[in-house]
């Protein structure tokens, strides 16, 4: 069985930890959001790609869900002494990966090629694809002191910690972007596609904003795991961003966002009362993943449901 997972943020990597324990890793492909990618000084930050790389290689710091466990921060601390405004605390080994991306991009190497080099260097058997080799950037329109300001997602979430009145979210350049090499083939060859429990607006939305990818998904069996339980996002700014796009912050809002492509919506057991407003198949499970057993059980529930259809 082959599956393709759409991933961004920190929710989906937790579920990936479950799938990689019960499926041959070479049968898992992941298409990753790059809408938050940005240069910081001389390094290239691709947070969602790096998190997936570290998840598959068992290096992820699963307390912060970015960077490597056990990393040191000598470079970051030295930069701060020099007056650097580096807000995100980047570890030394993690910085090396980001330096590799920056230097490779400046040489004209495609992002899909860079990620594949890094994947192989970390002995990862699963395929990992950036959503596009072209720059698609998530932008957040906020209002501050009666003035509208357009921010990169990194500035909105890292510098401002999401504390702003959000008016809208855009995916800059998505109208012109193409799927990265290997993405469409991975979708076509998979038995089903899984949209992980990530923020629909800025973790999955940029991937779906590329028309080639969304059109390919319309031809496949698609599962989507809700990142919202009850009226609350499990983590991150999903609630604020869904409100800004006009979606209710609950399972119904998640369904409305994905309704053009989703066949099976995976909801937490506590959301059983939402079924009547959702016009697709619904799988109920424990979607709160606190332990590795939780992650494996959710992955297994999804696979078992697929096999029973």
Curated annotation (Swiss-Prot):
Task: List keywords of the entry alphabetically.
Answer: Magnesium, Transferase
Under Gene3D superfamilies, the record lists: CofD-like domain (1.10.8.240), CofD-like domains (3.40.50.10680)
Report the EC number(s), separated by commas if there are several: 2.7.8.28
Q: Any keyword DNA-binding? A: no
Question: Which pathway does this chain act in?
Answer: Cofactor biosynthesis; coenzyme F420 biosynthesis
Domain of life of the source: Archaea
- Transferase listed as a keyword: yes
The reaction(s) catalysed by this protein are: (2S)-lactyl-2-diphospho-5'-guanosine + 7,8-didemethyl-8-hydroxy-5-deazariboflavin = oxidized coenzyme F420-0 + GMP + H(+)
Can you supply a Gene Ontology BP term from the record? F420-0 metabolic process
Cofactor field: Mg(2+)
Q: Where does 7,8-didemethyl-8-hydroxy-5-deazariboflavin bind?
A: 50, 89
Matching entries from InterPro entries are given as:
CofD, CofD-like_dom_sf, FbiA/CofD
**UniProt GO molecular function:** LPPG:FO 2-phospho-L-lactate transferase activity; magnesium ion binding
One Pfam family here: CofD
Protein family = Belongs to the CofD family.
Q: What does this protein do?
A: Catalyzes the transfer of the 2-phospholactate moiety from (2S)-lactyl-2-diphospho-5'-guanosine to 7,8-didemethyl-8-hydroxy-5-deazariboflavin (FO) with the formation of oxidized coenzyme F420-0 and GMP.
Record note on quaternary structure = Homodimer.
Name of the protein this chain belongs to: 2-phospho-L-lactate transferase
